[in-house]
From Swiss-Prot:
Keyword Ligase recorded: no
Species in which this protein is naturally found: Lactobacillus acidophilus (strain ATCC 700396 / NCK56 / N2 / NCFM)
Gene name of the encoded protein: glyA
Cofactor(s), names only, from the UniProt record: pyridoxal 5'-phosphate
N6-(pyridoxal phosphate)lysine modifications at: K225
Protein name: Serine hydroxymethyltransferase
GO biological process: glycine biosynthetic process from serine; tetrahydrofolate interconversion
Length: 411
């Protein structure tokens, strides 16, 4: 059914964004490229349907096919992560986290999460976020020397503040996380353990990172990033009693009608993630990240935080280049390499300026980049950050970026 002509301004902006994605090396760790099937599902007629409630328990009629779609997403998710419970309705990772807090906590309860400058997320207790306003939040950090999780410090803080909930997981941490150590600390202080695996869910699904599902009380994730699905959230658990609380906290607690067209996209993505080639993809994501980290680590003026990576991302300290993270992000944008500024451990600069960059490989790997391409990309970043005012350098890097994007088009 047609109601009106397309907005020329809108579709011009969409075409320009499509062109930008095609011609840019995308290194933002939280971004990826979905399949045509995921886009088709998300753009389907399901966007027309309201479906408050859960499969078999809706407040609206006409949901028989919607129920099938959402149940497929639930079943695929449970199989993918070997979990007994899955809620696929959260509109985002933040709302997934909010639902957990609403289900398990009361306003003013104590939560303990990773500090922002250590690699944590806003929703892990940052003072500017609901999680740091509605709850009494404390933070843990990294070992100053290793720049890895300091479990002695985490235990010490937990014993002091007696949290009701400990949040494990990160948005900018490049090492394997020992979930059992968090579990032991949570048990010692009588806290729930929630794991936010938004960044590493694809690695967990393919056994490239230990799974938190058997260890944590509750696990949240986004469905994009390394899962290569539509933008959205999900909650998983092996505790069915907690699952019941989660369902009620999400709906009717904090959300109304679920976005069933997005849930269809999630179902398609989870189906793709269950195929053997997805494991091959994730393995290549990690190989590409390690290859980039090695190149950065060999440079004279760029340092990889913690000395390397075990997953899909790394944080690079660019202090010795004389540039701020904001400067570097803008400079790289100019040569068609997209990154994001990132605080480094103990960063003295504000989160709007920073002393580092976060680099991730999910999107370039989806385009077909291999280790050689990843090393080349890292070398180009070093070249431009080391010589930012040289027009010849800028033009050379632009040319090389164009060749790489032409070699590996977005398909």
């Amino acid at each position: 059914m047609k109601y009106a002509e397309k907005s020329p301004a809108l579709w011009d902006a969409i075409r320009q964004e499509e062109k930008r994605q095609q011609n840019t090396i995308e290194l933002i760790a939280s971004e990826n490229i979905v399949s045509d099937a995921v886009r088709e599902a998300q753009g389907s007629v399901l966007t027309n349907k309201y479906a408050e409630g859960y499969p078999g328990r809706r407040y609206y009629g006409g949901c028989q096919y919607i129920d099938q779609v959402e149940q497929l997403a639930i079943d695929y998710a449970k199989k993918l992560f070997n979990a007994k419970f899955a809620n696929v309705q959260p509109h985002s990772g933040s709302q997934a986290n909010m639902a957990v807090y609403q289900a398990l906590l009361k306003p003013g309860d104590v939560i303990l999460g990773m500090g922002m400058d250590a690699g944590g997320h806003l929703t892990h207790g940052a003072k500017v976020n609901f999680s740091g306003k509605e709850y009494k939040s404390y933070e843990y950090g990294l070992n100053v020397e290793t720049e890895e999780l300091d479990f002695d410090q985490i235990r010490k803080v937990a014993l002091e503040v007696k949290p009701k909930l400990i949040v494990a997981g990160a948005s900018a941490y490049s090492r394997i996380i020992d979930w059992q150590k968090f579990r032991d600390i949570a048990d010692e202080v009588g806290a729930y353990l929630m794991v936010d695996m938004a960044h590493i869910a694809g690695l967990v699904a393919t056994d490239q990172h230990p799974s938190p599902i058997p260890v944590a009380d509750i696990v949240t994730t986004t469905t994009h990033k390394t899962l290569r699905g539509p933008r959205g959230g999900m909650i998983l658990s092996n505790n069915l009693e907690i699952g019941k609380k989660i369902n009620s906290a999400l709906f009717p607690g904090i959300q109304g009608g679920p976005l069933e067209h997005v849930i269809a996209g999630k179902a398609q993505a989870f189906y793709e993630d269950l195929q053997p080639q997805f494991t091959d993809y994730i393995k290549q994501v990690v190989k590409n990240a390690k290859a980039m980290a090695e190149v950065f680590d060999e440079s004279e003026n760029i340092r990889v935080v913690s000395g390397g990576t075990d997953n899909h991302l790394m944080i690079i300290d660019i202090t010795d280049t004389g540039l701020t993270g904001k400067d570097a992000q803008n400079l790289l944008d100019f040569v068609n390499i997209t990154t994001n500024k990132e605080s480094i451990p103990g960063d003295k600069r504000s989160p709007f300026i920073t002393s580092g960059l976060r680099i991730g490989t999910p999107a370039i790997t989806s385009r077909g980049f291999n280790e050689e391409d990843a090393r080349k990309t890292a070398s180009l970043i070093i070249e431009i950050l080391s010589d930012p005012d040289n027009e010849a350098t800028i033009e050379h890097v632009k040319k090389e970026v164009h060749e790489l994007t032409k070699k590996h088009p977005v398909e």
